[in-house]
UniProtKB/Swiss-Prot annotation:
The keyword Transcription regulation does not apply. A zinc finger (C2H2-type) spans 325-345. Residues 70-94, 175-211 are annotated as: Disordered. Keywords: Metal-binding, Nucleus, Translation regulation, Zinc, Zinc-finger. The gene is frbF. PROSITE patterns: ZINC_FINGER_C2H2_2 (PS50157). FR901469 inhibits the activity of 1,3-beta-glucan synthase from Candida albicans and Aspergillus fumigatus. With minimal inhibitory concentrations (MICs) against Candida albicans and Aspergillus fumigatus of 0.63 ug/ml and 0.16 ug/ml, repectively, FR901469 displays greater inhibitory activity than other 1,3-beta-glucan synthase inhibitors such as, WF11899A, echinocandin B, aculeacin A, and papulacandin B. C2H2-type zinc-finger transcription factor; part of the gene cluster that mediates the biosynthesis of the antifungal antibiotic FR901469, an inhibitor of beta-1,3-glucansynthase, exerting antifungal activity against the pathogenes Candida albicans and Aspergillus fumigatus. FR901469 is a cyclic depsipeptide containing 12 amino acid residues and a fatty acid chain. Positively regulates the expression of the FR901469 biosynthesis cluster genes frbA, frbB, frbC, frbG, frbH and frbI. It is found in: Nucleus. GO terms for molecular function: zinc ion binding. Residues 73-92, 183-204 have a biased composition (Low complexity). The keyword Metal-binding applies. GO terms for cellular component: nucleus. This is C2H2-type zinc-finger transcription factor frbF.
Amino acid sequence: MHCPQSARKTRQQQQHPLTDRCAYAGSANMPSAVAIPAPLPPSNCEEGIWLSKSVLMSLLFPNQALPAAHQVSSVETPSTSTTSTSTTTSTSRAASEFDANYCNTVRNPYIPPTPEDKFPVTPPPSLDQTAMSSPAACIPHESGPVRPKQTVAFTPGFSNPYPAFIEQSSVSMPVYEPTPHLHTQPQTQSRPSTQTPHQHQQQPYTFATPPYQPYDHIYSPELDLSLLSTDFSLYPQHPQHPQIPPPDLSLWSPSIDAASPLAASSPDPTTLWAPAIPIAPPQPASKQDGPIPRCWDHGCNGRRFSSIGNLVRHIKEQNGPRARFECRRCGQTFTRSTARSMHVKRGRCEGTMRSKGIGGK
């Protein structure tokens, strides 16, 4: 006796002979600890493929975000030359032509890591994976329209199993604009007031009582009390404290008593501000500078001499110095030997003149 439920399952397997192979191919290389979802009916076959791929991608690439269900491309299985595989392929093509929800086979190109390995086996980095690691590529485009499926044939040495998904996501990639950090914002926004400290200082001070009221007894009675009622709010640039008395202007008045100790101790302003004249050091007198040597004694009447030495010699001669050099021919005395020699050479010697017959004596 045949059960109606078993007959229904047999009929479904005949119509879709690759449904069991799809579930087996998706779970062949997965660890035993991962729960494999049960095969789904043909209406939900596309969602089942996306769920199995998401489980495999979460195991192989734990740090990458998963794509949306409509962005995963389907994969076709290569056919063999045997009769059984050709029959199965023709049956699957016929089923895919008449059934829009037909489930294609899924095959994992990578081997998952085993517990004996120290490090997980990951594919080499590529430019496509670098693009997937960007924040904009990880955002799933669930709100956009569903794109048609694209068939991709995998090669054994290719590092990225989903190039079509990356190309689709790079075309419709949104512009990623990072928000400014809190530390980069200007600090002027945290101030409660918009005025600068300098503007706070320039605000006028208003007093309820007239200033300098507790110091009225210090000043003389001749002081006009109307000055105390001056409106100081008209001078905002120079605020004054009410407890500081004004300076005594009598010290700066021009009428100062000469007998006051301040006037007596103050020095003469002309002596303080007189320019200092530089004093040049004494220089030795030259022959051209100074008075001309003259002799006013011995009846010379101011005779001039070319040098001071000649004047001294003249004085010694007039005062009767002792004769040291005497001419042998005429007996004339001289104070210097040079004068005696010059006396002979110039022909002034009387004895020489006599010998030559020049003189009359």
